[in-house]
Amino acid sequence: MALERCDVEKIAHLARLGLNDGELPRITDALNSILGLVDQMQAVDTTGIEPLAHPLEASQRLRPDQVTESNQRDAYQAIAPSTESGLYLVPKVIE
């Protein structure tokens, strides 16, 4: 499927892109080459090939989900300018 100039103008309008007349031929050629590559990829027979999320069988070594820091909320709120019921009070910024 090849794009025409009017197709690229419509796509540019929908995408809110301001293309001038000098850019349209270059953009049209670039989009047509991208669509040509997509056509090549779609032509490949992939029956029997399992989809991959990653080309290698890799797994992440995750650390155990353990609490490593103590709760210091009281110490942090002691130095805060204003708190109430465990919450930080800040000036109103939106009316």
Curated annotation (Swiss-Prot):
Q: What is this enzyme's EC?
A: 6.3.5.-
Tell me if ATP-binding is a UniProt keyword of this record. yes
Q: InterPro entries, from UniProt?
A: Asp/Glu-ADT_sf_sub_c (IPR036113), GatC (IPR003837)
Q: What class of enzyme is it?
A: ligase
On whether Cell membrane is a keyword of this UniProt record, the answer is no
Subunit-structure text: Heterotrimer of A, B and C subunits.
Q: What is this protein called?
A: Aspartyl/glutamyl-tRNA(Asn/Gln) amidotransferase subunit C
The species this protein was found in:
Pseudomonas putida (strain ATCC 47054 / DSM 6125 / CFBP 8728 / NCIMB 11950 / KT2440)
